[in-house]
Amino acid sequence: MLSLDRITSLRSLLAGAALSVLCLQPSISGASPDETNPQPSDFPARKVYSPHANQNFPDRVLFGDMHLHTNLSPDAGLLGTSLTAEDAYRAARGRTVTSNSGQPFQLVRPLDFLVVTDHAEYIGLAVMIREANPILLSNPHGKWLWENFTAGGERAMAAFASIVSDGTTGNDRLGDTDMGSTIWGDFVKTADRFNEPGVFSAMTGFEWTSMPGGNNIHRVAVFADGADKTGQVLPFSLLDSQNPEDLWKYMENYERNTGGRVLSHLHNGNLSNGTAFSKTRFNGKPVDAAYAEARIRWEPIMEISQIKGDGETHPFLSPDDEFADFERWDVGNLDGSAPKKDEMLQYEYGRSALKVGLELEARLGVNPYQFGFNASSDAHTGLASTAEDNYFGKMASSEPGPNRFDGEVLRAVDPALRI
């Protein structure tokens, strides 16, 4: 504690110091105000310090489905799906619709957006078969398909298998039947009718269904535009090319020629047998910088989860992750022609693909797998249903009913690899 004498002495010392400073002031006080006091003009104008000031950031989480099939997809329409794109958009808006099995369906919560993504290959074939379309019947293979699907039973299964075979080989046995142009034009106009900016986004897309050797490298293309632009093109099919680099060229040409926007995403790497996120291109050459730049430009997201299995990781890759076994589908490739091997897994799943991308970036300077993630249904019912207590299945045959999980969607080439 300071004594009264010490406090008095301290005050005297501070007073003396202040007086000493004041004695120095005359030489300064004689200067003009402009020389001693900074003026606003002395400092150049500058932007605000915070680079994020006055910026608006998204503050709403929107939910939707970016991968849904209707009766326009051959593997849906030929296996019992009758719901149309119009039905799909109505259901997504929260309306009650009648399902393919005749049951009422309504979502728990309406979606904010929906992308209908029917297969580009033979789009609308099922509709043409049901209508006995003259254009289809004038084609020898088209007539054969119509006869076999009309007969039903094993003949219908054989006809369906032939379509799957065309998807595996890229063999277009129908040729140019003008099927796609009218059907696609009607579809994109349907999306425009249901689109309500700020309330519900009815978007168009298609699935490019390449699976060379039965290995799934499917991509879903999603357009940001209306029919005025999407109506200028037709979907790009595996019958045009099985090489994803050609799909990217199609997308580039679309944007250049229409001024529109399009992106794509790969799904079900778990059924690719190591080809989804490989270090090798489709042509067998190593991934290079040009490939990496094109891939991340046109495929900025990956579909990480859907009905045909979860694509985040695998117990073999993440042995300490207790959730790595979630919804696995890892027996073989898509058509059940080749079994899975452990060395394939790191090139199939999203988490390990991020690591592969970093390895490639260290060598190439570009990361082809620096993507974001989305999850979709890939339902082939026209119904974007995923809730456990409101689930209407993958196909029309798996809609609610006592036998919904019986039978096969597709017969595996190798019976041991049941699909």
Regions flagged by a language model, labelled:
Residues 2-15:
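Bacterial N-terminal signal peptides that target proteins for export
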Residues 13-25:
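Bacterial N-terminal signal peptides
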Residues 5, 19-20, 61:
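A general, composition-driven signal for non-globular sequence regions
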Residues 3, 26-27, 39, 378:
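Generic low-complexity segments that are intrinsically disordered, proline-rich and/or Lys/Arg-biased
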Residues 24-34:
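Bacterial Sec-dependent signal peptides at the C-terminal "C-region" and cleavage site
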Residues 32-419:
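Extended, charged catalytic domains and RNA/DNA-binding interfaces, predominantly
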